[in-house]
């Protein structure tokens, strides 16, 4: 668990390094989930740099042979040896258009964020998935 805490602190530092504190916000939801509210116009560039930063910073958590192999073997929670991929960052984005903000409630926004994160995590390795509410024809689903 100590190593996991180090990784979370590393991620938090990478997040803080890539935001503009006068326009952006970083929050820790829990576990390995963080929330970014980005008001910066160059948010896409910032997120791409964040992916690079985190990838580079994570190298210190591995031995050379792990980096070369692209994975490592460790005991899983059941005590069995298992191959694990190297750490990667998955970012789910909800790009909000001001007109859509007035029609979304908190549960709809949370659902969109959950969907974006889900799609980002489906990709192997570092990824960003954007749900763009500025896209023509975007209609939020009714809250269930």
Question: Which ranges hold each PLM region?
Answer:
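Protein kinase-like catalytic domain
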Residues: 19, 58, 114-117, 121
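Short helix/loop segment flanking the catalytic signature motif in cyclic-nucleotide metabolism enzymes
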Residues: 33-68
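Conserved long alpha-helical elements within nucleotide-processing catalytic cores of c-di-GMP signaling
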Residues: 1-16, 20, 27-31, 35, ...
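Intrinsically disordered, glycine/charged-rich C-terminal tails and inter-domain linkers
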Residues: 116-144
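A short helix-to-beta-strand capping loop
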Residues: 22-23, 125
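Solvent-exposed, charged/polar functional surfaces in cytosolic regulatory/catalytic domains
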Residues: 14, 53, 57, 119
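A short glycine-enriched loop-to-beta-strand structural element that forms part of the catalytic core
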Residues: 28, 62-115, 127-134
